[in-house]
Amino acid sequence: MQLPFTTEQFFDLLAAYNEALWPALVVLWMASLVASVLLFSSRRPSDRWLSGLLAAHWIWSALAYHAAFFTRINSAAWAFAALFLLQGALFFWHGVVRGRLSFAPARNAWAPVAWVLIAYSLLYPGINAVLHFSVSRIPAFGVPCPTMIFTAGVLMLAKPRSWRLSIIPVMWSVIGGSAASLLGVRADYALPIAGVALALFSLQGRTDAKTVLEHVQLRPRFRA
């Protein structure tokens, strides 16, 4: 696969993005850290508040990163922006408006995976700083890849499991993961792992729900 821009152009773009918007990126990172700590503790954040944070992550990446910056070197970024806006709208509609999402520390086999992904997304700026020997010309926070990894972790702690909310994040794990090796962003090698984990988690939930439904339908009915 050949990208429509060079590695140098990509890292120059990241430098411009970080320089222009770093205060907002720090705020977004701090909000994500606080939400994660509260979710891990008994004082978990409001479900609507956490849904709103996920919506903010995706809408920010859509407008501030894809539309405002990435379109300068890649025309496909307009399509990416539309996908990210749609994902943000889905989180806002299902989680904030309708209150259909609930988040809590889970006690199952997926919980360790969820927390590793959340922790990795928060450490993502530091990992890139070490790997690239820079604090400016790197993907830091408020960009698509850590957004996807953070989202995957949080969704694994959500009820009910929603495969609809997982489609676009899993798609991005393929898109971003395929570009990671070409651009030399080794921190993004975690994207395919996060995508596979989220896909399996969501499909398992769909299978479990189907099994329950079939059990209810097949249960004998007795008339009084």
Question: Model segments located where?
Answer:
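Membrane-interface helix-boundary motifs at transmembrane edges
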Residues: 38-49, 71-74, 97-109, 157-162
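Central hydrophobic cores of alpha-helical transmembrane segments
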Residues: 50-59, 164-176
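Juxtamembrane "helix-exit" motif on the non-cytosolic side of transmembrane helices
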Residues: 63-71, 123-133, 177-183
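Loop-to-transmembrane alpha-helix initiation sites
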Residues: 75-80, 182-196
